[in-house]
């Protein structure tokens, strides 16, 4: 976050403050129902869903639901991703064809950094 890598590069010229972080609490993501409200009450203006939800094997099956549910229930925008996708994950998902569907370019775009950055996150 401090280096503005990955999805945080959208805030290059802004001050950032971390208001909290949590796990999803495992499938089906019970924390997603409550944690955004607490973060919003503490001053968060955007919720970032972890890059791990995208790069996992397989990616989180509830990701699309989470990114629609949070803004609908709490009125706070959601960005998919935090840190850059590591190179080794990108290569594996390319070989597996995981991100070949039409929804994936938009989902991975915020965290798809240049190769040098991806390698630094390996």
Indicate where each model-derived feature is located:
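Conserved mixed alpha/beta catalytic, RNA-binding, or beta-rich assembly cores of soluble enzyme
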Residues: 1-39, 59-62, 76, 84, ...
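Mid-chain, well-packed structural core segment of small domains
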Residues: 33-64, 68
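Short, ordered loop/turn segments at secondary-structure junctions
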Residues: 52, 83-85
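Alpha-helix-loop-beta-strand connector modules within alpha/beta enzyme cores
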Residues: 70-77
């Amino acid at each position: 976050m401090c280096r503005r890598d990955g999805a945080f590069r959208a805030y290059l010229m802004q001050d950032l403050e971390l208001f909290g972080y949590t796990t999803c609490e495992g499938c089906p993501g019970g924390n997603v129902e409550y944690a955004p409200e607490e973060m919003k009450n503490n001053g968060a203006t955007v919720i970032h869903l972890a890059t791990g939800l995208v790069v996992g094997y397989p990616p989180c099956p509830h990701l699309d639901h989470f990114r629609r549910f949070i803004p609908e229930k709490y009125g706070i925008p959601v960005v998919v991703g935090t840190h850059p996708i590591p190179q080794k994950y990108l290569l594996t998902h390319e070989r597996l064809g995981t991100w070949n569907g039409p929804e994936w370019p938009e989902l991975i775009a915020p965290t798809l950094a240049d190769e040098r950055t991806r390698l630094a996150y390996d």
